[in-house]
Structures are given as structure tokens and as C-alpha cells.
Amino acid sequence: MQTSDTRALPLLCARSVYKQYSGVNVLKGIDFTLHQGEVHALLGGNGAGKSTLMKIIAGITPADSGTLEIGGNNYARLTPVHAHQLGIYLVPQEPLLFSSLSIKENILFGLAKKQLSMQKMKNLLAALGCQFDLHSLAGSLDVADRQMVEILRGLMRDSRILILDEPTASLTPAETERLFTRLQELLATGVGIVFISHKLPEIRQIADRISVMRDGTIALSGKTSELSTDDIIQAITPVVREKSLSASQKLWLELPGNRPQHAAGTPVLTLENLTGEGFRNVSLTLNAGEILGLAGLVGAGRTELAETLYGLRTLRGGRIMLNGNEINKLSTGERLLRGLVYLPEDRQSSGLNLDASLAWNVCALTHNLRGFWAKTAKDNATLERYRRALNIKFNQPEQAARTLSGGNQQKILIAKCLEASPQVLIVDEPTRGVDVSARNDIYQLLRSIAAQNVAVLLISSDLEEIELMADRVYVMHQGEIAHSALTGRDINVETIMRVAFGDSQRQEASC
């Protein structure tokens, strides 16, 4: 946080910034200021305009009108190269690394020779507590480590204006604290940080000022100490929302296809002593109509387990039983045909085709079954059904998925999975980077799916989310199920955290 009064000359002033897409005003005269040595948090619902504003500041997208004042000079528009030269660096929510290059090559990519300091990079790695093998491929990193590499790229460029878009979305509490410690050191040097997040406790911990965007405008702005949580939430979501899906939404959400019907509580998916990359000896049972939470720290093996269940990774031992039949040797497509559907944690690189239309994305899994690029007259109608059910905001079915906000992209991905008519739905971090309003929609959606006797496996690093949603909870620690299933009052953040850190005598998982 800001520790001095050396803020007379702001690092950045955005004045009267306007932006329009396809006739829709997404920014309506935005004013935004960032001072030296401060963290200015930016909040807002999905589609509020946060990402568009930051892309304009970073030179990725031009504004239609308005100016950016940086270092006492005014600019109508910037390019990414010019923004970097001015000390502006945007760390995106979805890390954009070269998977086939080493970690070292990714960090140093595009740097001027004078900045190619191995010692500087090693010092930054040590300060952040990162224990990377710099010669390993970036593609081998999990989401949390890819986020750290992106932050390192910005720090290596001596950035004076650092824009962090959901930087802690995939970080553990310990990793978050390490990051905040490093940010405090940067602030002391006069760096200014724009911090985009949906996590209010973190914002109160790190931010000097808060601005809330709504519908392309600044709805609220002030010092963190002077704004109450109620003020902030009201500014983000001014319209009172229903706590559950409406009757019409539930009607639109009736799952398609001829799925085998199981009574609630019937075992649907059983894992017997499963061993694979990142996990070992995992045994559990998932029942029809329940939401089974799978908690654990980043690196505990949860995503590796999910990808193995879907056939994306090789199984080394044990059995996967779906409806009483072993599916170990089945391909991903064959598992999909039998009703096993997986929603990956990284929607942009693994879940959606960002350049394809919304209608195509929603029907992508059924396209695979009919012929990859097959099209039907029903695709637009299918998209419309999910728009009504999930409250997805878009202009036309043909627009590309990349044009949507993060929350609406996530809803398109969920619709894609539901259209495959799942018996078992594995959802990995379903609300990562999603605002309060859209998060509530997704929670009610998952409950509605489970009410149709779909078996839901919920993988989440948000322990409050696990506590809120799960009927039973397994916790993974260092690749193993660390305890028998938690139920009832034992499903609470404190107990889950204790088990996740291994501070509990391990018991054999009881199914």
C-alpha cells in the first residue's frame, strides 16, 4: 500500500475514455487515475468494461475517444510496444505463454539486451519463492505457476504501471501472501498497481483505493478505508437477484438426450485405487444427484485426476467404473458417449474455440459425434435455450466466443457440457475469475443439474465454495485422498484447510 505522499504527479490518468463494439457502448466516458506507490483495485461484474479499459491502457485495443496521460504526456492511443516502453505491463487472467519454449525463454522473450539479466531473474524468483526449473517447458506448468511466470515477465521489464487481472484466482493462500509481499516491495519503489479481482478480503488487504465499474461507467470510487462491503456489493450488483433459478429457467435447462435415469444416491462413478501422473491410490464413489467436492491445494493432483478420468492422461493403475462397467481403455470420445463430461479449468485454452461462433461452441461436443464441422439448423435454437436458462449476454449467435466477458464465456462452456447430456459432470474451478452475480448463477445451475440426478464432481480451490455447494467432500494432499469423506458439519473451511495441509491423520477413504 501507499506509504508516502509522493503522488502529486499521477503515473496514469485516463480521461473521458469511450469505446463501442458492434453499436454497443462498452465504455462511457471513463475517468481513472493511478498514483505512484498505490494499489488501485478495479471491480465490476462480467461485461462491466474492466478488461476493455485495461486493454486500452496496455495498447491492445484503441479507444474511440479520450486520452491517456502518462508521465506528463497525453496519448490518444498506444500500441503494446509503446505501452511497454512507457512502463505499462498487463498480466492477463489467462496466462499467455509459449508452451513449447522453456520457462526462462518465456520470461526473457522480447526483452532488450540490456535487460537480459540472469541475476535479476534469479533474484525475482527467490523473492517470489518460485522454485522453477528454468529449462523446463512452460507447457508443463499448472495454472498457478503460469500466472507467476507472467508476473515475472512484467517485473523483468521494470514496469512502473503493473496491471494484474485476477492474479490470485489460481493461487493458494501461501502463494497469495508471497505475491502480496513482493507487491509491497514494488510499491515502495514507486510502482503503481491496478488490481482486478472479485475477492473482497484480498482487495481490502492490498488496495489503497477502489473503483467499481458497472455498465461501462464508474459506479463507485473512493479510498478503501471509506467504502463498506455493502457499498461495494451494491455498486457491483444494483439489481436484487433471485436466489434460485426461476421456473422458466429450470424449464429451459431440462437436459437433452436420452440419458439413463438413476435414482438419487445410486453409485454412478467408482474409482478403485487409481494411480496416475500426480496422484496415487485414489478411491471414491460419486452418486447420482449429488455434488461431490474435491478440495486441496494447488498441485495436490485434482486436475490430473480429472483429466485422467476423461481420458486425457494415461492411467497407470486401478479401475474406473462408470455405471458398473470398466472404462479404463475407452477413448475420450467413447467416455463422452457414455455420459462422462469434463469442464476444464482453463476455459480459453482448453474449453472453448475462441474464434468460433457461440452457437458452434455450445454444440461442439455434439458436433464431434455427428462430424466435427457439421452444422444443423438447430444450433441457434440450442444457443437461445441456454441463453434463457443461464442468462448469457451476447448480441448474436455468430459472434466469436472471445468477444464475451469472462463470466459469459464460462456460461457458454457450461452450456457446451450440458448439451452433451452428462450422467457425470466433472467441473474444474467453474467460477474462477467470475464475478459475484455470475457466480450465483453458476451455483444455482449446478444445483439444478444435480436435481436432475446428474452426478457432479466439483473441483475448486475456493473452500467457501466447496462448503456452500458440496454434499460430501474429499480432500487431496500430495496426490492422495487425505481423509475419509467429510459430511454434514465437518464440511467447513477450517476442517478442509487443515486436511489439505496434511494436519490430520490420514484415513483410508470410505466410499
From Swiss-Prot:
One of its GO terms (molecular function) is ATP hydrolysis activity. It is an enzyme of class 7 (translocase). InterPro entries: AAA+_ATPase, ABC_carbohydrate_import_ATPase, ABC_transporter-like_ATP-bd, ABC_transporter-like_CS, P-loop_NTPase. It is a peripheral membrane protein. GO terms for cellular component: plasma membrane. CDD domains: ABC_Carb_Monos_I (cd03216), ABC_Carb_Monos_II (cd03215). It comes from the Bacteria. Residues 12-240, 240-503 form the ABC transporter domain. It is found in: Cell inner membrane. Its EC number is 7.6.2.13. It holds the Pfam family ABC_tran. The complex is composed of two ATP-binding proteins (LsrA), two transmembrane proteins (LsrC and LsrD) and a solute-binding protein (LsrB). Belongs to the ABC transporter superfamily. AI-2 autoinducer porter (TC 3.A.1.2.8) family. This is Autoinducer 2 import ATP-binding protein LsrA.
